[in-house]
Amino acid sequence: MQPLSTELILIRVTGEDRPGLTASVTEILAKYDATILDIGQADIHNTLSLGILCKTEEQHSGFIMKELLFKASSLGVTIRFYPISVKEYEDWVNMQGKNRYILTLLGRKLSARQISAVTRILAEQGMNIDAIKRLTGRIPLDECDSRTRACIEFSVRGTPKDRIAMQELSLIHISEPTR
């Protein structure tokens, strides 16, 4: 008997978030005994972005995608599928050994200019951003409150081309006067 062929599929779900959405998607994967290799989810202002990388038997992949398409339609979300080659997956797994850093940006408020400066410096240094997370509460539109604080965490990976220069540049280019 010949071993079953497997497929790697990256599933991306976007749309209005609601309770039970992730459960609905993963229940279909469970029905076909798929293995979840990676999963990530973000919700910004009730807008969901869910990514699932799964491994399944080739004979089940069509059924999985069909059921997920119907489920996405009934939930009013968009779903996309991307085949991942074994080589792409292995290359991704081999990136695990790269250095990881957490960069935290603090301020009374954080502007697009400051975030742009941080991300530009990271890119120039050859660093890749794995995740960005707001750590503080939601910022009110009325910015009169002097107690308002903003904090964003960047999870980055790689080896900086020049770590000392990166630290010096960061402090100079990111600071903005408080208004």
Residue ranges: model-predicted function:
Residues 97-132:
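Surface-exposed interaction/gating patches
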